Amino acid sequence: MVSKLTSLQQELLSALLSSGVTKEVLVQALEELLPSPNFGVKLETLPLSPGSGAEPDTKPVFHTLTNGHAKGRLSGDEGSEDGDDYDTPPILKELQALNTEEAAEQRAEVDRMLSEDPWRAAKMIKGYMQQHNIPQREVVDVTGLNQSHLSQHLNKGTPMKTQKRAALYTWYVRKQREILRQFNQTVQSSGNMTDKSSQDQLLFLFPEFSQQSHGPGQSDDACSEPTNKKMRRNRFKWGPASQQILYQAYDRQKNPSKEEREALVEECNRAECLQRGVSPSKAHGLGSNLVTEVRVYNWFANRRKEEAFRQKLAMDAYSSNQTHSLNPLLSHGSPHHQPSSSPPNKLSGVRYSQQGNNEITSSSTISHHGNSAMVTSQSVLQQVSPASLDPGHNLLSPDGKMISVSGGGLPPVSTLTNIHSLSHHNPQQSQNLIMTPLSGVMAIAQSLNTSQAQSVPVINSVAGSLAALQPVQFSQQLHSPHQQPLMQQSPGSHMAQQPFMAAVTQLQNSHMYAHKQEPPQYSHTSRFPSAMVVTDTSSISTLTNMSSSKQCPLQAW
């Protein structure tokens, strides 16, 4: 007779025989173990199974479990040898109590799976659970297995004791038959429906009580224990096929109408049926996984809430980053960043506006150490009409904010007056200077026409609060070696003997826009800060003529 044992079982028997155990001793040991009630499964006559022993015509289920249990211990299964740490699950007790033909078929199927590779069986069960969206919690509730151990066994092939695998395989076999009956429910006519199909209908309507119906001859004690614990209803879980359909619909319409939701219900149920390998006409067999219009509505509502929450988080993060980036500028002052609350005489840069898109920003910093002064120019003037400047306002940008640029405070007025006359003019020229707002240029020019040049510097401020400052004589050149006086940048100028006008000419040549033929228009004068003009008395007439024709860009400090 050809042996029905697997190669591993044959190796185990060979190892037992080679260890000195005789056939008679082995058979006697098996007979002593068979009546043991430890596993709660009685001896029953079953068809020949792969785990059969020496007697091929009569094979009890318990003998199969015993052989598998021994094999599990040798392969490193967890738990004690006698299985006292794991009570017999109700599902095995039900299998013991059933005497129907269906129960015999289930036991035979469990025996076949126990004789196969555990990892192969685990992958098959995992794939079936994913196909039908069955959660592991349902398996845990029915079999009593530890969910962590079950997850490791299904995902990584962690060894599991044979008794536990028998409970898992029993659940798998029964679940297959249960789902098959659900999809075939409407095939049977209501007139010819038998008692068994009536019980199946009850199980379909109440899937949380998915316990196998008991035979008529079964005692009440056998079925009392499984019904004591109420099974939890399976929570609805969206399948991957339905989620793909819903996300595509969400991209098209975030709040679909009722008709659109009903169309999505049909499409999702069809996809779920195709995923399970059944006809879409049997969508009722999905049971707790049946997609309804209410579930589709809730899904879209949850997606909209999630999207709104993510947008709020993004806005909060952006606002927080903006606040953190502004805090160092507002709370920490530095020599290169003056606070906006500084008085006008501490500001070292002025920004003006000009009509058109072409804009040039200007800032000029002057720092002085001890008795020496050094000019550091960064650049860059916009064209400003003298008539556009109003002496009645502070140094403001067009948007009404104080401008803070790199550099220290302004040097004394006498220092400003001598910037353009260093080492090129005698001290007599530097004393015939006038410092006045732009609005007072015309008035001073008219007064100069009727009187001789003033020999004392004149300082005309906005509020009249500036005290007269005596001019300071500079006996040494204040420019740094890498900087040249502005006068040297305009060779051949007819105003070479007038230092300030030479600087004005240079700025006019470098910053006037050639393509601007018409006179530029400027913003309201109230938006521009007050500016002081420093020049000598001999040049005031020329400056007046240039300002009246709006062709002179003026430099402000």
UniProtKB/Swiss-Prot annotation:
GO BP annotations listed: anterior/posterior pattern specification; branching morphogenesis of an epithelial tube; embryonic digestive tract morphogenesis; endocrine pancreas development; endodermal cell fate specification; epithelial cell proliferation; gene expression; genitalia development
Disulfide bond entries: none
Pfam families: HNF-1_N, HNF-1B_C
Intracellular or extracellular location(s): Nucleus
Residue numbers carrying Phosphoserine: 49, 52, 75, 80
DNA-binding region(s) in UniProt: 231-311
Stored InterPro entries: HD, HNF-1, HNF-1_N, HNF-1_POU, HNF1_dimer_N_dom_sf, HNF1b_C, HNF_P1, Homeodomain-like_sf
Entry-linked Gene3D superfamilies: Homeodomain-like, lambda repressor-like DNA-binding domains
A GO cellular component entry from the record: intracellular membrane-bounded organelle
Matches recorded under SUPFAM superfamilies: Dimerization cofactor of HNF-1 alpha, Homeodomain-like, lambda repressor-like DNA-binding domains
Outcome when changing residue 156 to E: In RCAD; no impact on interaction with PCBD1; reduced coactivation by PCBD1
Effect of residue 76 to C: In RCAD; uncertain significance
Residues covered by the HNF-p1 domain: 1-32
Keyword flag rRNA-binding: no
Bias kind Low complexity: ranges: 328-344
A single GO molecular function term of this UniProt record: protein homodimerization activity
Occurrences of domain POU-specific atypical (ranges): 93-188
Keyword Nucleus: yes
Stretches the record annotates as Disordered: 64-85, 324-352
Subunit and partners: Binds DNA as a dimer. Can form homodimer or heterodimer with HNF1-alpha. Interacts (via HNF-p1 domain) with PCBD1; the interaction increases its transactivation activity.
Disease named in the record: Renal cysts and diabetes syndrome: An autosomal dominant disorder comprising non-diabetic renal disease resulting from abnormal renal development, and diabetes, which in some cases occurs earlier than age 25 years and is thus consistent with a diagnosis of maturity-onset diabetes of the young (MODY5). The renal disease is highly variable and includes renal cysts, glomerular tufts, aberrant nephrogenesis, primitive tubules, irregular collecting systems, oligomeganephronia, enlarged renal pelves, abnormal calyces, small kidney, single kidney, horseshoe kidney, and hyperuricemic nephropathy. Type 2 diabetes mellitus: A multifactorial disorder of glucose homeostasis caused by a lack of sensitivity to insulin. Affected individuals usually have an obese body habitus and manifestations of a metabolic syndrome characterized by diabetes, insulin resistance, hypertension and hypertriglyceridemia. The disease results in long-term complications that affect the eyes, kidneys, nerves, and blood vessels.
Function as written in the Swiss-Prot or TrEMBL entry: Transcription factor that binds to the inverted palindrome 5'-GTTAATNATTAAC-3'. Binds to the FPC element in the cAMP regulatory unit of the PLAU gene. Transcriptional activity is increased by coactivator PCBD1.
Family: Belongs to the HNF1 homeobox family.
Protein name, as recorded: Hepatocyte nuclear factor 1-beta
Gene it is expressed from: HNF1B
